[in-house]
Amino acid sequence: MPKMKTKSAAKKRFSMTATGKVKAGPAGKRHGMIKRSTKFIRDVTGTMILSDADAKIVKKYMPYNR
C-alpha cells in the first residue's frame, strides 16, 4: 500500500502541539484592518487552538504529524 500524502495547504496553515492539538492563525487579519477595532486586532494576533471537531478534519489531511 502506498504512503498517504500530506496536503500541502494544510501543512502551511496548521501545526501540531506536543499533546496532539492543532494550532492555527485566526482568520480575518489579511486586509481591511483600518476599520477594525483595536480590541479585534489585538485578539487576532498570535495563534489559537482548533476545536475538537475542526482538529479531527485537519488531522486527516496531515497523517504523519500526530
Swiss-Prot record:
GO annotation, cellular component aspect: cytosolic large ribosomal subunit
Disulfide bonds: none
PANTHER family in the cross-refs: 54S RIBOSOMAL PROTEIN BL35M, LARGE RIBOSOMAL SUBUNIT PROTEIN BL35M
Transmembrane portions of the chain: none
Biased composition (Basic residues): 1-14
Stored InterPro entries: Ribosomal_bL35, Ribosomal_bL35-like, Ribosomal_bL35_CS, Ribosomal_bL35_sf
Gene3D superfamilies: 4.10.410.60
Similarity comment: Belongs to the bacterial ribosomal protein bL35 family.
Taxonomic classification: Bacteria, Pseudomonadati, Pseudomonadota, Alphaproteobacteria, Rhodobacterales
UniProt GO molecular function: structural constituent of ribosome
Protein name, UniProt field: Large ribosomal subunit protein bL35
Region (Disordered) residue spans: 1-34
One GO biological process term: translation
Keywords on record: Ribonucleoprotein, Ribosomal protein
